Amino acid sequence: MTELTETLELKLVEPNAHKHRKLCETKQVYQDALEAAFNANCTTQSAANDVVVNYDLSGYAKNALKKYVPQLCGGSYDAKELHDDHPVRFTNEGPKLDHKPQNAIEWYVQIPHHDDYHLWLPATPNPEQREWLEALHAGDAKMGECRLFTRDGEWYFHIVATRDVEERETSSAATPIRVDIGEASLLTVCHRDESDSPTAPN
């Protein structure tokens, strides 16, 4: 078995005014918490927790921050400054995916806002990733970290998904070569003598 990883993209379908405001609130508070933890140079999850615990975010966003900030502060990223438009990260326990094939918009994603309040939003996926989404919904793939962000004025949600696939067997035997009719005709045409009669190639 081989483990494959894919980042699935869902575009959130025109959130109403209330949900749009809640998404904006989550994004702003997350950015504030991220900046505070980064400026405090939190190199451990415990140090990051001491900062982000004071912010009005879901536990899933706080847990993602506790993992992410130490990577920025001397870890794998070792960033010197912070970009002002980071995506909101969530650990995989919070977001949920639902599929209603009978609806015009089939896919719905649950995005945590606070610990006791979540937003369900309709979403349109990348058509080429439908098989992955169906596997994720059926439990045949695992959800990893999720990210909420805006692009060109639209809201998007990314889900990192992994699943196991069977390895294809490779044969050591010679692979037969097939020639289609068009190629066969081309070979015949290419090997004719001066009188236009077929001849064996040199």
Residue spans of the language-model regions?
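Nucleic-acid substrate recognition interfaces
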Residues: 1-202
